[in-house]
UniProtKB/Swiss-Prot annotation:
<feature type="compositionally biased region" description="Basic residues">
    <location>
        <begin position="34"/>
        <end position="47"/>
    </location>
</feature>
<feature type="region of interest" description="Disordered">
    <location>
        <begin position="89"/>
        <end position="108"/>
    </location>
</feature>
<keyword id="KW-0160">Chromosomal rearrangement</keyword>
<feature type="compositionally biased region" description="Basic and acidic residues">
    <location>
        <begin position="147"/>
        <end position="167"/>
    </location>
</feature>
<feature type="region of interest" description="Disordered">
    <location>
        <begin position="28"/>
        <end position="55"/>
    </location>
</feature>
<dbReference type="Pfam" id="PF15419">
    <property type="entry name" value="LNP1"/>
</dbReference>
<protein>
    <recommendedName>
        <fullName>Leukemia NUP98 fusion partner 1</fullName>
    </recommendedName>
</protein>
<dbReference type="InterPro" id="IPR029280">
    <property type="entry name" value="LNP1"/>
</dbReference>
<feature type="region of interest" description="Disordered">
    <location>
        <begin position="147"/>
        <end position="178"/>
    </location>
</feature>
Length: 178
């Protein structure tokens, strides 16, 4: 008996919900009605989701098969930043996308290959730079020391010349006032 009461409660609740949402509920169409509502809810959900791409009608080209477009496909294109939709121009005609799928795919492949080459080059270079960087650093330090020593030698020479020049000039000045 309790099982029948539960079913009655479910049926009465379903009737109440149907009347609340403005649907006519009939027991013989219960399954068909539910399936129709489920399909309607799915399509409504797809169209109600926001998407930054403009939703424009697509004209299938002769070499392509007609394709079912859903909002989920457009959302995927938004996330992957693929601009593979036709643009509607001012004169009323459709323009082909700037990049076709083949071109964008080849660009991605080229980019990934160049990135891998750079990565390999950097890893090889960084592995070889360990001892070389120390060697270069030592060479730079030696060069600095040489430059400093040369400057000191030049300063000493210039100071000696100045002392010599003053020494030679001093007797002339001493003789001049006499």
């Amino acid at each position: 008996m309790e099982h029948k009461d539960d079913d009655d409660d479910d049926v009465s609740f379903a009737k109440w919900m149907s009347s609340f949402w403005g649907h006519s509920w009939r027991e013989e169409d219960q399954r068909g009605l539910r399936e129709r509502h489920r399909l309607q809810a799915t399509s409504h959900r797809k169209t109600s989701l926001p998407c930054p791409l403009p939703v424009l009608p697509r004209i299938p080209s002769s070499d392509c098969h007609p394709r079912r477009h859903s909002h989920e496909d457009q959302e995927f294109r938004c996330r992957s930043h693929v601009r593979d939709y036709r643009k509607y121009s001012e004169d009323g005609s459709f323009k082909e996308p700037l990049e076709s799928k083949g071109r964008s795919h080849s660009k991605i492949e080229k980019f990934s290959e160049s990135f891998e080459r750079q990565l390999c080059f950097r890893t090889k270079r960084s592995a070889s730079l360990g001892p070389e960087s120390r060697k270069e650093r030592n060479e730079r330090e030696c060069l600095r020391m040489e430059i400093k020593s040369r400057k000191k030698v030049e300063e000493e020479r210039s100071s000696r010349k100045e002392e010599h020049g003053e020494a030679h000039m001093a007797p002339l000045f001493e003789k001049g006032p006499e």
